[in-house]
From Swiss-Prot:
Mg(2+) binds at D9, D11, D135. This is Putative 5'(3')-deoxyribonucleotidase. It comes from Staphylococcus epidermidis (strain ATCC 12228 / FDA PCI 1200). Keywords: Hydrolase, Magnesium, Metal-binding. Signal peptide: none annotated. Its EC number is 3.1.3.-. The lineage of its organism: Bacteria, Bacillati, Bacillota, Bacilli, Bacillales.
Length: 179
């Protein structure tokens, strides 16, 4: 029997990209932005005067290589990998300098995944999978399979998609549909 495919976004789903950006912005611009102040907002809209700084941080060599892994992501993805074909679908077109760092990060933190299943793309409607776990509503709305929204500060008021709030929720979601 053919295994179903799950495509998983990297930034804000597997990796805490926003936390690293906020930390760097706070240090460099002498600000005190708190993660909870971002609920329902994007960082670039909160500090439009520092939008260039945010992009500079994202373009720095090594930035994406040093991100923290989201809690429980490794263990849950490893368990899912036993029953599903897992693909990592990360939008890398906006920051082309991120390719190498993202690839190395995935190899380090998810060594049990097949690197041939790492997809660096722009729009995720090109991904042929049964499920997409992503924090970006724009990606989820163009995906042709089942869209699952991973909670992030910028999408808390989005209600069009089934939602998971962390990797334990992801595990529970897929455990419930296997029965």
């Amino acid at each position: 029997m053919t295994r179903q495919r799950i495509a998983i976004d990297m930034d804000e789903v597997l990796a805490d990209t926003l936390g690293a950006v906020v930390k760097a912005v706070n240090e460099r611009a002498d600000l005190n932005i708190k993660m909870e102040s971002l609920n329902g907002k994007k960082l670039k809209h909160m500090i439009p005067e520092h939008e260039g700084l945010v992009m500079d941080i994202l373009k720095e060599p090594g930035f994406f290589r040093n991100l923290d892994v989201m809690p429980h992501a490794q263990e849950v993805v490893k368990q899912l990998n036993e029953h599903y074909d897992i693909y990592i679908a990360t939008a890398a077109m906006d920051v082309p300098t991120s390719f190498h760092d993202k690839y190395e990060w995935l190899l380090e933190y998810f060594p049990f995944l097949d690197p041939q299943h790492f997809v660096f793309c722009g729009r995720k409607n090109i991904i042929l999978a049964d499920y997409l776990i992503d924090d970006n509503p724009k990606q989820l709305e163009i995906f042709e399979g089942k869209s699952i929204m991973f909670t992030a500060s910028h999408n808390v008021y989005e209600h069009r998609f089934e939602r998971v709030s962390g990797w334990r929720d992801v595990k529970n979601y897929f455990n419930s549909i296997e029965k």
